[in-house]
Amino acid sequence: MSRRCELSGKAVMSGNNVSHANRKTRRRFLPNLCQVTLISDALGRQFSLRVSAHALRSVEHNGGLDPFLLKASDAQLSSRALKLKRAIEKVQAVAA
């Protein structure tokens, strides 16, 4: 399982620890990932996703999983999230 957010694409970054003597050693910056269960109103189901805390705040800010996915670009979504987005678009197209 990769350390990558399924909704925002946020992943591991690398950098340096810098000591007081200005010595540099390599380190990794890990994203703050949480295993959460989000509910899709359009599909009427729950989905378990591994998302960053930042993406979780964005989902809440946008009014839920469905509006967030519809607004998000396809490039930053994981394959599972992209399938969810397509399913939500299909349900909304039938309802309209």
From Swiss-Prot:
MF annotations from Gene Ontology: structural constituent of ribosome
* Transmembrane as UniProt keyword: no
InterPro entries attached to this UniProt entry: Ribosomal_bL28 (IPR026569), Ribosomal_bL28/bL31-like_sf (IPR034704), Ribosomal_bL28_bact-type (IPR001383), Ribosomal_bL28_sf (IPR037147)
* Signal peptide segment: none
> A GO biological process this protein is involved in?
translation
What is one Pfam family matched by this protein? Ribosomal_L28
Report if keyword Ribosomal protein is assigned.
Answer: yes
Keywords from the UniProt entry? Ribonucleoprotein, Ribosomal protein
Mind naming one GO cellular-component term on file for this protein?
cytosolic large ribosomal subunit
Family statement: Belongs to the bacterial ribosomal protein bL28 family.
This chain belongs to the protein called Large ribosomal subunit protein bL28
Please name the source species: Parvibaculum lavamentivorans (strain DS-1 / DSM 13023 / NCIMB 13966)
Q: What is the lineage of its organism?
A: Bacteria, Pseudomonadati, Pseudomonadota, Alphaproteobacteria, Hyphomicrobiales
- State the gene name recorded for this protein: rpmB
